[in-house]
Amino acid sequence: MRKAVMVEGAAKPGGHYSHAVIADRLVFVAGQAGADPLTGALSDKFADQVRQTLKNIQTILRGVGCDMKDVVKVNSYLTDGSRFQEYNAIYKEFFPTEPPARTTIGCQMGGILVEIDCIALLPS
């Protein structure tokens, strides 16, 4: 089974892609940025973007019947690797125990400071 999903109330995609794709019991969440889902506004503050990005992921996961505890893998992209410790502290707010596997990469992105995608497992 493969199903592309758009979640009502989630931030609009910045391109031609689904919020997530469900394949069997795996949920592949597309890369999310820190845009406010109601206004599309993007804060210029790193911490605000990180929190909003993780909230956007949480909204998508809840829309398909998962939560942050169901995430098994995260890929994080930061424009400024020197902010890793700050990123990590905020990340721990959303994954306080048994965090998923994670890769964090420094890269250049137009206009956003952080992007995160993830894979979650649908509850049985």
Where do the language-model regions lie?
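N-terminal presequence-like segments and the immediate start of the first folded domain
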Residues: 1-72, 78-124
